């Protein structure tokens, strides 16, 4: 009997472990099972993963892939997941081409061309933060060169995803966390989690992959070679092709003298060259094209990708356990997070290399190449602060307030007008000892103290001063750059101000370097063109129109000025403008990665949503109070839930019921106290009555005692 029980327990535990194992682990078991059974390699070039379309980087897996059926490609060469299908090329598709890329603006990726060219609001910056793009742009501008690219591409399979597949367990869990925050009205935390989702899974989902290999040579040759050469563009591409053939041994039997003459001038003007073997065997000098092709079979990689935006896959079909309206809110929140990622990595500026206003860091042209710079006077900055909550010992405004050195107060000097740049709430957590009296039955009381965590809040309002009329020369402040805790001052290449300048504090951690010394400070002075933020434009763009018509200012820089990031303050981008050509040297900046929103120090009060109704199809979802899972509600359940929320008219509301309960408890306590007091009083009165009666008849008691004694002695 004991053996039977042990067997049952063993299989129960085994079943629980199997059912409780994450899908990712189940997938690994399936892969190994198929490899052992079929003795075939697994196709590693698979769609269904996340993709960062700014950096051209593969991200976390979005779609779930399983190997329960041990499927293979049509040619039986590779094991593939159940959720994908392949389109094999019946014959080897070997392609060789040469091209000239005169400008970085029309550069196309070798391995992600299709997904980079998808049309969207921010498609102009797709791939602009990839390693290959930044390398090419830097070399073109540094060497004043153009780029030639020769490549041999061998396509083996096109791998596509099945539209009916499911979301990966980890990705789905993060979506459920976002939905839980949204349904409980914790919007700020939901935004923060959505930005973390973009950080982990990218901006798109790969739906199709071209599997194969590519051998690529990129040369950078002086731009003057193409301009001064009597040869045509086709002759230059032919020279690039011949240079590639010299690198990769094509084993041509004939070698013409004209080929040597044609390539000699090309090679003498080459400033940089790189050969990449993407897939196949590693490249080495002298490798033959035949040897490289023969090594492709077991070394397939993705040589092109197609995909759709991440939020496209957040729909009711993918999340059937959630109410449709809630799924739409999750999708919109993720879409907004992706757009914010694109926005904070868009660098407007002049992209014309021949313009004096050229901005090396700009990745989108804003039409500023033709503008002429105007000298503007800078009236300083200041910041006001109001404490909203917190202990007396937690004074937030002491480090948030900043007076204008030109006035010594929170104001602008004469002839200048204040521009409110941004208003935000600053939060800081603190602990303090909180004591209160705790009583039982209103009689037994004691003092209870506990360490309580609370959040102090203060509102700060940042202003800068713009000239509203003609001001005297040298009346404002000199601008010497700025820096924050996460950025350096381009004037000093450090988190500091130039000599003769002092910092003014703005926002929570921005330092603006200014000087009032026009003799010593002019050496490091930078022509300043104003501030603007996500909420307020720059009045210097067209001051006459803004002042006369009262229309909102444009969020851009005046002509002759270039835009630069000051900081991202809790999801809001603040930019400043300096003379074009300054602060644009050095290397290209890396991508600014999310999250950009600061998570709340304490969770907001939850609204505990229990019913979601879809107005489009009149369907309602109810959240189970025990399992916290959503399900479609029946009419009877809906009426019962509505009665629980709003009351049925015959009962008491939650507050009324609490009041009645408290009242009854108090009355009972009073009654019990009075009863105890009355009982004690009654007993005391009874004792007093007996004593009085005894004092009135003392003789009776004495006679009785004597008689008793006599009776006791008479027999003697």
Curated annotation (Swiss-Prot):
Residues 413-656 are annotated as: P2. Residues 1-20 form the signal peptide. GO terms for cellular component: cytoplasmic vesicle; phagocytic vesicle; phagocytic vesicle membrane; phagolysosome membrane. Disulfide bonds join 34-70, 350-369, 385-397, 435-449, 439-445, 534-572, 557-577. Residues 30-345 form the MACPF domain. Keywords: Adaptive immunity, Cytoplasmic vesicle, Disulfide bond, Glycoprotein, Immunity, Innate immunity, Membrane, Signal, Transmembrane, Transmembrane beta strand, Transmembrane helix, Ubl conjugation. GO terms for molecular function: wide pore channel activity. This is Macrophage-expressed gene 1 protein. It comes from Pongo abelii (Sumatran orangutan).
């Amino acid at each position: 009997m004991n053996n039977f029980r042990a067997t049952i327990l063993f299989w129960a535990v085994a079943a629980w472990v199997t059912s409780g194992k994450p899908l990712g682990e189940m997938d690994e078991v399936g892969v190994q099972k198929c490899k052992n059974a079929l003795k075939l390699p697994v196709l590693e070039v698979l769609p269904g993963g996340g993709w960062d379309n700014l950096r051209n980087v593969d991200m976390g897996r979005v779609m779930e892939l399983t190997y329960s059926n041990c499927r293979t490609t049509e040619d039986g060469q590779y094991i593939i997941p159940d959720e994908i299908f392949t389109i094999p090329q019946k014959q080897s598709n070997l392609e060789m081409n040469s091209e000239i890329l005169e400008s970085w603006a029309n550069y196309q990726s070798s391995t992600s061309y299709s997904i980079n060219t998808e049309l969207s609001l921010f498609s102009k910056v797709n791939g602009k933060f990839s390693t290959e793009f930044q390398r090419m742009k830097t070399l073109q501008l540094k060497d004043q060169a153009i780029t030639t690219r020769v490549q041999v591409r061998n396509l083996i399979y096109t791998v596509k995803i099945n539209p009916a597949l499911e979301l990966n367990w980890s990705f789905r869990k993060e979506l459920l966390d976002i939905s839980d925050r949204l349904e409980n009205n914790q919007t700020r935390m939901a935004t923060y989690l959505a930005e973390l989702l973009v950080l982990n899974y990218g901006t798109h989902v790969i739906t199709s992959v071209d599997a194969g290999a590519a051998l690529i040579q990129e040369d950078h040759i002086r731009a003057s070679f193409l301009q001064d050469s009597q040869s045509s563009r086709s002759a230059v591409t032919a020279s690039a092709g011949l240079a590639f053939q010299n690198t990769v041994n094509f084993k041509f039997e004939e070698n013409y003298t004209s080929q040597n003459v044609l390539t000699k001038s090309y090679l003498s003007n080459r400033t940089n060259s790189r050969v990449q073997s993407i897939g196949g065997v590693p490249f080495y000098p002298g490798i033959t094209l035949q040897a490289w092709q023969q090594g492709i079979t077991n070394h397939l990689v993705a040589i092109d990708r197609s995909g759709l935006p991440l939020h496209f896959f957040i729909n009711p079909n993918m999340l059937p356990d959630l109410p449709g309206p809630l799924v739409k809110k999750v999708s919109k929140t993720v879409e907004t997070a992706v757009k914010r990622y694109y926005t904070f990595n868009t660098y407007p500026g002049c992209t014309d290399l021949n313009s004096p206003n050229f901005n090396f860091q700009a990745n989108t042209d804003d039409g500023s190449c033709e503008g002429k710079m105007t000298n503007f006077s800078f009236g300083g900055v200041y910041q006001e602060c109001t404490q909203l909550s917190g202990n007396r010992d937690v004074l937030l405004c002491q480090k948030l307030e900043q007076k204008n050195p030109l006035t010594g107060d929170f104001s602008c000097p004469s002839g200048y007008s204040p521009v409110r740049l941004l208003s935000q709430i600053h939060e800081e957590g603190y602990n303090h000892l909180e004591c209160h009296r705790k009583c039982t039955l209103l009689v037994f009381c004691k003092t209870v103290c506990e360490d309580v965590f609370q959040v102090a809040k203060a509102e700060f309002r940042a202003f800068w001063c713009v000239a509203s009329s003609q001001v005297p020369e040298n009346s404002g402040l000199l601008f010497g750059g700025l820096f924050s805790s996460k950025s350096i001052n381009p004037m000093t290449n450090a988190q500091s101000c130039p000599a003769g300048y002092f910092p003014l504090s703005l926002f929570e951690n921005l330092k603006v370097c200014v000087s009032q010394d026009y003799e010593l400070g002019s050496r490091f002075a930078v022509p300043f063109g104003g501030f603007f933020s996500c909420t307020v434009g720059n009045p210097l763009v067209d001051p006459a129109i803004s002042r006369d018509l009262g229309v909102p200012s444009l969020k851009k820089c005046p002509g002759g000025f270039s835009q630069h990031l000051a900081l991202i303050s809790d999801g809001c981008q603040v930019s400043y403008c300096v003379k074009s050509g300054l602060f644009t040297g050095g290397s290209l900046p890396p991508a600014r990665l999310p999250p950009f929103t600061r998570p709340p120090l304490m969770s907001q009060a939850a609204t505990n949503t229990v019913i979601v109704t879809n107005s489009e199809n009149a369907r309602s979802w109810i959240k189970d109070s025990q399992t916290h899972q959503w399900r479609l509600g029946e009419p009877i359940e809906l009426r019962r839930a509505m009665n629980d929320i709003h009351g049925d008219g015959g009962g008491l509301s939650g507050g009324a019921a609490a009041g009645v309960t408290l009242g009854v408890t108090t009355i009972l306590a009073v009654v019990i106290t009075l009863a105890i007091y009355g009982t004690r009083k009654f007993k005391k009165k009874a004792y007093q009555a007996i004593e009085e009666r005894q004092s009135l008849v003392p003789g009776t008691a004495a006679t009785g005692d004597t008689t008793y004694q006599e009776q006791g002695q008479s027999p003697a």
